A protein has these predicted regions:
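Structural alpha/beta surface segment adjacent to cysteine/selenocysteine redox centers
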Residues: 11, 17-121
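C-terminal cap of thioredoxin/glutaredoxin-like
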Residues: 3-32, 37, 103, 112, ...
């Protein structure tokens, strides 16, 4: 029976961006299903897990974060703007849009849209809290424009809240986190361990 990975992430997270396509490739190669679960990291997960938004971290931690982002971007050959114009940014609307697409078009389309939105922040200096940017992302992925309206539905909001709570219940405290049968792999730098776990079946 194929394994399922619960993929908890935030569309505004640089670490989610750096791991996104590699994770997708690993899951596909292993024949694993992906549950696409964008979560309210700053509003729900951090307050109960001891995490802090970047701006509230000690200066030393903020500085080293930039060092690590640069290192991993270079190591992985992925372009990344270390200090994008629109960051910090509220990722709630982008997360809800991903959920709306997941509900209607499925996980493959949702993963593709998530990639587009992450690149918008970390490569293209676009503002993912701007409805025009979200609409453009849908168009780039050839997804229905009406998903923008669906993203504001009660169904989507309830799913967003439920997924954020599920992350907390699973012990998730940061993004990205990949959970397989209750086992957490936190961070894009743990994808090798996830790959080994999926290979075990």
């Amino acid at each position: 029976m194929p394994l399922t990975v619960d993929y908890y992430f935030a569309p505004q997270s640089p670490w989610s961006y750096l791991g996104h396509l590699r994770f997708w490739d690993i899951a596909r190669s292993a024949g694993a299903a992906i549950r696409v679960l964008p979560v309210d990291l700053g509003g729900k997960v951090f307050p109960v897990s001891g995490g802090l938004p970047v701006a509230k971290r000690a200066p030393q931690r903020q500085a080293y974060r930039l060092v690590e982002l640069k290192r991993f971007g270079e190591l992985l050959g992925q372009p990344i703007n270390l200090q994008p114009k629109y960051f910090p940014v509220n990722g709630d609307d982008a997360a809800r849009l991903i959920i709306a697409v997941d509900l209607h078009e499925g996980s493959h389309a949702a993963m593709g849209l998530a990639d587009t939105l992450m690149r918008a922040v970390w490569v293209q200096d676009r503002h993912i809290a701007d409805e025009a940017v979200l609409a453009a992302a849908l168009a780039e992925r050839e997804l229905p424009a009406r998903r923008l309206g669906d993203a504001h539905s009660q169904t989507v909001q309830e799913r967003y809240e439920a997924d954020s709570q599920a992350a907390i219940d699973a012990g998730v405290f940061g993004a990205p986190s990949y959970v397989v049968d209750g086992e957490i792999f936190w961070g894009q730098d743990r994808l090798d361990f996830l790959q080994r776990r999926l290979a075990q079946g």
